[in-house]
Amino acid sequence: SAPRGCWTKSYPPKPCK
């Protein structure tokens, strides 16, 4: 259940600000 928004393709994935 990830929050909406764009995510980086790095690992671990982090929400982009």
Curated annotation (Swiss-Prot):
A GO cellular-component term linked to this record:
extracellular region
Which biological processes are named by the entry's GO terms? defense response to fungus; defense response to Gram-negative bacterium; defense response to Gram-positive bacterium; killing of cells of another organism
Keywords assigned: Amidation, Amphibian defense peptide, Antibiotic, Antimicrobial, Cytolysis, Disulfide bond, Fungicide, Hemolysis, Secreted
Main localization is: secreted
Pfam family of the protein (one)? Antimicrobial23
Q: Keyword Zinc-finger on this protein?
A: no
Q: Where in the cell is it found?
A: Secreted
Superkingdom as given in the UniProt entry: Eukaryota
Q: At what positions is Lysine amide found?
A: 17
Question: Does the entry annotate any disulfide bonds, and if so which pairs?
Answer: 6-16
Query: What function does this protein fulfil?
Result: Has antibacterial activity against Gram-positive bacteria B.megaterium Bm11, S.lentus and M.luteus, Gram-negative bacteria Y.pseudotuberculosis YP III and P.syringae pv tabaci, and antifungal activity against C.tropicalis, C.guiller-mondii and P.nicotianae spores. Has hemolytic activity. The mature peptide inserts into the hydrophobic core of the bacterial cell membrane and increases permeability without disrupting membrane integrity. Probably binds to the outer membrane surface before aggregating to form transmembrane pores.
What the record says about family reads: Belongs to the frog skin active peptide (FSAP) family. Brevinin subfamily.
Q: Name the chain's protein.
A: Ranacyclin-E
